């Protein structure tokens, strides 16, 4: 707002009475990964994708010229949602509005209405609109959302982002100067650059917040769809560099998430390496993947001009960097994967006898509802898988862990849970006699009730926001299925220890389920292979 005022502009008031339909915008592109173990993985990460997209297309309320009326797109999304899809699921597989796609395909038989910012409207064929944007010397840019911007003047938002981006670069440079020399100064400048990074990334969120004066769904959705289109190009171009095919889900592409691409050239080169026709090492792989990242960066200005009519100078702000090179990786589903990387941003980490470092995303070994002992065990198993340990050895280690875990008392086999709204549910139950609530809240309420029934004034009472350990119970006279005790309770009362804990059920939930979540994609059937109930059969088999 201050920046706009300094330019002599008047900022409009906030829009009122907007429905969800007016504010919902398509989200980021997240691909389904090619599940399983992959070798020699590289990743390219686009620098500040959303802020860069806003700058590259000069997006701002004051630079909007018009909007392709999204009749076809809205109809498609509504039809999908009518069939039960969520708004996000309805956008699955789409990288742009149908109107934008029709324009880029220069479809002569498709008529599209343009709503001009001055209040007028005109109807054209998609082919005519393409010519209007790309072949008429107009200073116009067309976003993947079908929004037309002008680049005659720099908008306030891209101008701010440009300044913040330059300031962050300076702060990062100062942080690097102090790294390893002055910890206090390094931490200071590192935190400063982090704050600036948050500013850069949060501005996109503000544009999509109805409470923001700069709110405009056209800009917000233009940002995400342009981001999707750029990510699709990056994936397709990486695959073209490796296989010769411009395909965003080609043979070399493992996974894509918002602004990053995970790929491997190994399946295409493995035969040549094994036959001795090509040398292969970590150094060779790093050099190859650096070269691919450089080629992708060289492609961006031309792509931005071809896809959006963004001038090459503006399109050049889209840049990617080769982030990691990993020896192996395990990909499970969207947002859940782990890689053992040997190089990060041209800095080797497989030194001093170490195989590298593990980068894990969305796995149970990092979740707060997984017991610490299970987190540590899952980390150990994951490391074994990523370093090439054979199935038989992993099965033996899981079985060994299960025996140790079986010997632990029942109350140590529960799952950590945070209890919220306990007071609300308790009052609701007092008022109605019976209330529906999350299982872990019911378990906490059971602890409080049993504590009162045993006249226990020494044990802690569970209150709102407290962390608990939820333990499952066998059939009992009270009809309870679980109980949750406070994690900070240092001395568990005897009445609690005497409860009929369902050890088997907890072992299945805490061990078998967590292992299956991590390694199920490998198809190793670990549950039956490590079933401790089969011990007698495995020890005494008669043929």
Predicted regions: what is each one?
Residues 1-57, 61-67, 71-145, 152-153, ...:
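DNA-dependent DNA polymerase catalytic subunits
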Residues 161-178, 196:
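Non-transmembrane amphipathic alpha-helical segments
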Residues 173, 205, 236-239:
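Charged/polar positions within long, soluble alpha-helices
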Residues 203-212:
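Flexible hinge/switch segments at interdomain interfaces of large molecular machines
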């Amino acid at each position: 707002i201050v920046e706009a005022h300094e330019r002599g502009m008047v900022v409009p008031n906030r829009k009122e009475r907007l429905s969800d339909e007016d504010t919902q915008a398509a989200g980021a592109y997240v691909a389904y990964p090619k599940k399983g173990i992959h070798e020699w993985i590289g990743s390219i990460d686009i620098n500040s994708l959303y802020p860069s997209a806003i700058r590259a297309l000069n997006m701002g309320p004051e630079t909007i010229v018009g909007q392709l009326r999204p009749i076809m797109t809205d109809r498609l999304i509504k039809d999908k949602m009518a069939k039960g899809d969520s708004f996000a699921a309805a956008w699955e597989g789409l990288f742009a509005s149908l109107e934008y796609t029709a324009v880029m395909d220069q479809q002569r038989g498709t008529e599209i209405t343009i709503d001009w910012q001055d209040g007028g409207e005109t109807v054209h064929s998609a082919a005519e609109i393409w010519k209007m944007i790309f072949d008429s010397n107009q200073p116009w840019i067309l976003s993947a959302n079908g929004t037309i911007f002008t680049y005659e003047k720099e908008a306030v938002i891209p101008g701010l982002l440009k300044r913040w981006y330059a300031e962050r670069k300076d702060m990062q440079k100062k942080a690097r100067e102090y790294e390893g020399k002055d910890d206090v100064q390094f931490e200071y400048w590192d935190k400063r650059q982090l704050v600036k990074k948050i500013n850069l990334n949060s501005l996109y969120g503000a544009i999509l917040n109805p409470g923001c004066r700069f709110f405009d769904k056209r800009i917000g959705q233009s940002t995400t769809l342009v981001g999707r289109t750029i990510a699709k190009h990056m994936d397709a171009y990486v695959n073209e560099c490796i296989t010769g095919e411009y395909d965003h889900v080609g043979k070399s592409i493992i996974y894509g998430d918002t602004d990053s691409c995970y790929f491997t050239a190994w399946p295409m080169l493995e035969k040549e390496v094994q036959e001795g026709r090509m040398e292969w090492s970590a150094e060779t792989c790093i050099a190859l993947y650096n070269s691919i990242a450089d080629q992708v960066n060289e492609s961006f200005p031309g792509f931005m001009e071809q896809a959006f009519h963004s001038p090459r100078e503006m399109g050049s702000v889209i840049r990617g960097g080769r982030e990691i090179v990993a020896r192996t990786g395990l990909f499970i589903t969207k947002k859940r994967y782990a890689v053992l990387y040997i190089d990060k941003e041209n800095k080797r980490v497989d030194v001093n006898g170490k195989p590298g470092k593990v980068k894990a995303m969305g796995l149970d070994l990092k979740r707060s509802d997984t017991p610490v002992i299970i987190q540590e065990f899952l980390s150990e198993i994951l490391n074994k898988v990523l370093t090439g340990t054979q199935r038989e050895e992993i099965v033996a280690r899981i079985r060994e862990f299960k025996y140790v875990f079986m010997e632990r008392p029942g109350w140590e086999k529960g799952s950590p849970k945070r209890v919220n709204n306990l007071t609300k549910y308790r009052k609701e139950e007092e008022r109605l006699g019976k209330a529906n609530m999350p299982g872990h809240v019911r378990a906490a309420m059971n602890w409080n009730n049993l504590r009162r029934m045993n006249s226990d004034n020494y044990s802690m009472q569970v209150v709102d926001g407290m962390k608990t350990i939820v333990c499952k119970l066998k059939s009992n006279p009270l009809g309870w299925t679980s109980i949750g005790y406070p994690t900070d309770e240092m001395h568990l009362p005897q009445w609690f220890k005497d409860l009929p804990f369902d050890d088997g059920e907890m072992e299945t939930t805490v061990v078998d389920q967590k292992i299956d979540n991590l390694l199920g994609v490998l198809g190793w059937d670990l549950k039956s292979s490590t079933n401790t109930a089969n011990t007698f059969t495995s020890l005494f088999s008669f043929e």
